[in-house]
């Protein structure tokens, strides 16, 4: 039994608690083909249930709720227990996440903002009676499911993937029957910049009346951010080479494709009836590997936008004729949130300079390390330096490890911080440093602006184009460690002047990166594309 579950289901089952639900009597109504369902019902931990193919005579006075099943499906052994627990907790309608396809490689995480056309849902007895009274055919399970989703007052979404459909996923599994559909496609769902800022598009699209579904590979940390924002999420490894899932886009009213990495998808959708907004966040470094997949021409249904001039210039280097608008991302005002405060443990009597991002050559960690080494020892010892990020390049990682070994008292490395820890870092640091050789619009620098923290950035970043030198940040040219070191030395001796930049940094955030600014720009772009 256990070995037949998908890897996602196995991991969730290992963390699943047990609930005593045996006092709740469930009816499982599956009038159609139910071979797989019947087999998996034999393994249920919740034993107080009955499988029926008609409702009338089966609806005895002891039935507390009915699991409506319109399609044959395999249930995990904890499925009825979780549905019964939702009923006990006051839900009148409960659905769960699911996996699809052979082996369950595709997973659906239900939206908290809209109810999809679920083919399996638990309905309370009072709600079922209301649905039967309103139905043209009180025995029609599909009609009852649709009415239950419409009439329910207390819906519950169970976070476990309790169901496994052997077929491929379709649009109706994620979208409702009547809403406008926005389909967002991302090549990663990790905590890097592009997926994090894509999250900010979800509430904007929802405010425009769209139901939002996100397609990406397996969760790398950002999936829950999309769910919390109100999107449904579909995951499948290798989506860049899975054209059958791209077909979901053709069932949508708007498609937002994130980054140039999804160029094959744009090529497939160019010339179709669905409007496509292609949002570019990419640096020059990635284009040699992807340029052959970028269409030479784009049909009228595709519009390009970038997070700044740096990202636009990177695309223009290979497709100079493309028209690209500006769509700088917006981030929530984290400083106004009531997040858990904690002391990160770095010396409070020294200015803290931090950089956040994956360790790859274009991010320039070696330049930052070289600049720190160029500081006179007595100057370097007056400050603390922190590197945060996953090691993607051995040379960059070796540069940081060597520096932390030589300067263990004031140079530190952290592989990863949680979102709340990042917010605490931005609140507690003195200045951010982005030494990138090629970076369209570094997210962590923007997060620093939210907390009024200035940054020192390379001229080869998108941020350099919006900074006012010496007012809300600093730039240095030529990827030169010596010039970066000079700015660091000045900053180390003048932390009070960095602190005095707080108001200007906040103004820069509110002008270019706030949710309000982003909402206005994205709304205008979507209306231009769809109206």
Positions of PLM-derived features:
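Conserved donor-binding/catalytic core segment of Leloir-type glycosyltransferases
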Residues: 179-186, 347-363, 369-372, 386
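A short, well-ordered alpha-helix in the C-terminal region of glycosyltransferases
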Residues: 483, 490, 497-512, 518
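Short, structured helix-loop element that forms part of the nucleotide-activated donor/catalytic region
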Residues: 220-229, 384-409, 421
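Conserved donor NDP-sugar-binding/catalytic core segment of glycosyltransferases
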Residues: 78-105
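Short alpha-helical donor nucleotide-sugar binding micro-motif in glycosyltransferases
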Residues: 249, 416-417, 424-429
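Aromatic "clamp/platform" in nucleotide-sugar-dependent glycosyltransferases that forms part
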Residues: 437
